[in-house]
């Protein structure tokens, strides 16, 4: 049994399908679900729309969970990428989801980070780089990583950060360069 946030997103659906192929039961957390996920008996869909993360524990079946994959992140492209309110909310959600991971008895969280973490870190150490809106997203990812790792440690959860960079494929609908170039 595993839990996946952002399960209905571009990367989330691919991960869920790979997990299902390996025989896992998936608890999918997202704001909406397509029919493929919603109609699969191996998937338990839990809507997070208009809910506090602390309310979700009672909706997650009491099972032994091997891993909690945190993919959910608003504002990965477009104007929301530079919206500090959106990105700060993402940081809080990441920490709240890690606490939820511990609350449901899962001892391992995989946190989906971004290459923008490294770019932001370089920006913070340099006097030669002008700030841009994308650094708000990167700073959010970096903050979520650092705070999330701490929250995980304080709650007895193994924290595994993974960097996802320039991924594209079937189902992607972002405003990022590769997707928009392919569609032109």
Mark where each language-model region is.
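Rossmann-fold cofactor-recognition segment
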Residues: 40-53
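Conserved Rossmann-fold NAD(P)-dependent oxidoreductase catalytic core, especially the SDR/UDP-sugar
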Residues: 68-70, 95-136
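Conserved glycine-rich Rossmann-like NAD(P)H-binding loop of the short-chain dehydrogenase/reductase
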Residues: 24-35
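Active-site helix of classical SDR
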Residues: 136, 140-143
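NAD(P)H-binding glycine-rich loop region in Rossmannoid oxidoreductase-like domains
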Residues: 50-89
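NAD(P)-dependent short-chain dehydrogenase/reductase
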Residues: 146-184
């Amino acid at each position: 049994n595993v839990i996946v946030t952002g399960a209905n997103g571009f990367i989330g659906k691919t991960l869920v399908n790979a997990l299902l192929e390996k025989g896992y039961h998936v608890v999918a957390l997202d704001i909406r679900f397509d029919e493929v996920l919603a109609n699969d008996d191996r998937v338990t869909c839990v809507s997070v729309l208009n809910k506090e993360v602390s309310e979700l524990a009672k909706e997650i079946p009491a099972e032994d969970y091997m891993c909690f994959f945190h993919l959910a992140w608003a504002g990965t492209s477009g104007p929301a990428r530079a919206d500090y309110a959106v990105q700060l909310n993402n940081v809080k959600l990441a920490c709240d989801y890690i606490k939820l991971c511990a609350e449901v008895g899962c001892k391992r969280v995989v946190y989906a980070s971004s290459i923008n973490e490294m770019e932001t870190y370089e920006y913070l150490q340099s006097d030669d780089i002008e700030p841009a809106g994308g650094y708000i997203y990167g700073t959010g990812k970096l903050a979520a990583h650092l705070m999330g790792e701490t929250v995980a440690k304080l709650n007895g959860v193994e924290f595994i950060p993974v960097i996802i960079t320039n991924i594209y494929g079937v189902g992607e609908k972002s405003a990022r360069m590769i997707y928009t170039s392919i569609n032109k």
